[in-house]
Amino acid sequence: MSMRFCILGSGSSGNSALLVTEGARVLVDAGFSARKLGQLLAGVGESLERVDAVFLSHEHSDHAEALRGLKKFPQVRVFANHATARVLQEKLEYRPNWQCFETGARFRFADLEVET
């Protein structure tokens, strides 16, 4: 399986990385505004329109800020543990396409096997 992993940004102002495989485009955290994240993705030849999912490590804004702007992208699945999803949902005006999991679980997404 071929894959590409791009660090889009890392630090107190935001964290996000892009994982591209043959079957999926996944953001690992989304800690920038959706606009800024779109710019960062464009810098590596990608776009929010092409993202299939966001995997969130936790609820801090430097890891989850873009959720506010993902309302425009209902196809994007947002993976988080139940506690993280609950905390973030209280701050949002819409309901993302949550895909909740138990911490410690394993699951498949497209051609990826994920261990949490």
PLM-predicted stretches and their roles:
Residues 1, 47, 72, 92-94, ...:
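Short, structurally constrained coil/turn elements
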Residues 1-44:
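Conserved beta-strand hairpin/beta-sheet module of binuclear metal-dependent hydrolase folds
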Residues 9, 18, 45, 68-70, ...:
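Short secondary-structure boundary/capping segments
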Residues 15, 24, 50-52, 74, ...:
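A generic structural signal for short beta-strands and their flanking turns/coil linkers
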Residues 19, 29, 58, 78, ...:
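Divalent metal-coordination and catalytic microenvironments
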Residues 20-22, 41-44, 68-71, 92-95, ...:
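Short, glycine/charged-enriched secondary-structure capping and boundary segments
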Residues 34-84:
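Active-site metal-binding motif and surrounding structural segment of the metallo-beta-lactamase
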Residues 82-116:
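Metallo-beta-lactamase
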